[in-house]
């Protein structure tokens, strides 16, 4: 099993973007966003759309994606985190085997600056983030339009 890191310099192909988008959608459980939203976050990370870019981390075994994380850079520091971890998912058959922990450790080492995550308060993956040093600092309130 190896972790591959994609950013603006190690480009994602259109096929990679589709494959990773599908994986995240299929394995995000009950807390998933739309396919379109997931694809947009990957396109932003890959700098295929205007923005600061970010990172996509995937763990694979013989070409099969076992887990993936998407991080978007915010360009902010001191007052908000420089990075936001947008998506994390592990294939159902591999949950509980340390895949998410390894991916998250790699992500933390790779990303410069603070990392934030918006997560549903009922999502059990919160415990993984707490073990890695994440703290609940704020609540998000959103006016949806």
List each model region and its residues.
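Conserved acetyl-CoA-binding loop-helix of GNAT-fold acetyltransferases
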Residues: 90, 96-109, 131
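Conserved GNAT-fold acetyl-CoA-binding loop/helix
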Residues: 14, 22-45
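A short beta-loop-alpha structural element at the N-terminal edge
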Residues: 1-22
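Conserved acetyl-CoA-binding loop of GNAT-fold acetyltransferases
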Residues: 130-140
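Conserved GNAT acetyl-CoA-binding A-motif
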Residues: 111-121
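A short helix-loop-beta-strand connector motif used in the catalytic cores of GNAT acetyltransferases and
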Residues: 46-58
């Amino acid at each position: 099993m190896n972790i591959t890191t994609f950013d603006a310099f190690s480009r994602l192909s259109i096929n990679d973007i589709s494959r990773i988008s599908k994986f995240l959608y299929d394995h995000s459980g009950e807390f998933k966003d739309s396919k379109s939203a997931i694809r947009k976050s990957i396109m932003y990370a890959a700098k295929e759309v205007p923005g600061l870019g970010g990172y996509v981390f995937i763990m694979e075994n013989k070409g099969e994606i076992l887990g993936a994380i998407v991080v978007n850079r915010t360009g902010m520091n001191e007052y908000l985190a420089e990075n936001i971890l947008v998506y994390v998912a592990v294939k159902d058959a591999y949950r509980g085997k340390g895949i998410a922990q390894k991916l998250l450790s790699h992500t933390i080492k790779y990303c410069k600056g603070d990392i934030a995550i918006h997560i549903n308060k009922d999502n059990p993956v919160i415990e993984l983030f707490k073990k890695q040093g994440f703290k609940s600092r704020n609540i998000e309130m959103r006016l949806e339009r």
